[in-house]
Amino acid sequence: MDRAQKEKVVEELGQIFESSGVVVVAHYAGLTVAEMQDLRARAREAGGSVRVAKNRLAKIALEGKPCASMADLLTGMTVLTYSEDPVAAAKVAEGFAKDNKKFEILGGAMGENALDRAGVEAVSKMPSREELIAQIVSCIGAPASNIAGAIGAPASNIAGILSTIIEKAEAA
């Protein structure tokens, strides 16, 4: 790889570190090509990506970035799993690590916050952006449906009482 290619890789990695909601660093030694393809497919489905890069170039790309503290994790055969959604990459990495013991999560970064192994696990258990939006919408919609039910209830109660009175009158 010549100098121009290295500079391009550093620039691409820098953009990844700046634009990603979360970046997870893991060791992947011993994984087969099929297992790596499975990891990439899972990440793609979740809206994320997987990148294997030279640690030295990744460390250069981290210089001056908010997540620069993550540079200490870049040793050995490392892979970066990242996504704009702050939860997606962590969920993909955790799920893949449970299925593949050779995939060892080291930590990562979420914005300016460095994450250790437990931090990545905690982030993976959080609801995704879409799930949070759905929860908020249901919370906003619940009072309106309760009010509509309360307004409609007296009318249905009156109708029920009237039908009972009519039935009793007809029976007598």
From Swiss-Prot:
GO cellular component term of the entry, any: large ribosomal subunit
Protein function: Forms part of the ribosomal stalk, playing a central role in the interaction of the ribosome with GTP-bound translation factors.
PROSITE patterns: RIBOSOMAL_L10 (PS01109)
SUBUNIT field: Part of the ribosomal stalk of the 50S ribosomal subunit. The N-terminus interacts with L11 and the large rRNA to form the base of the stalk. The C-terminus forms an elongated spine to which L12 dimers bind in a sequential fashion forming a multimeric L10(L12)X complex.
Name of the protein: Large ribosomal subunit protein uL10
Keywords from the UniProt entry: Ribonucleoprotein, Ribosomal protein, RNA-binding, rRNA-binding
Protein family membership: Belongs to the universal ribosomal protein uL10 family.
An MF annotation (GO) of this entry: large ribosomal subunit rRNA binding
HAMAP family membership: Ribosomal_uL10
Gene Ontology biological process terms, A to Z: translation
InterPro entries, alphabetized: Ribosomal_uL10, Ribosomal_uL10-like_sf, Ribosomal_uL10_bac, Ribosomal_uL10_bac_type, Ribosomal_uL10_CS_bac
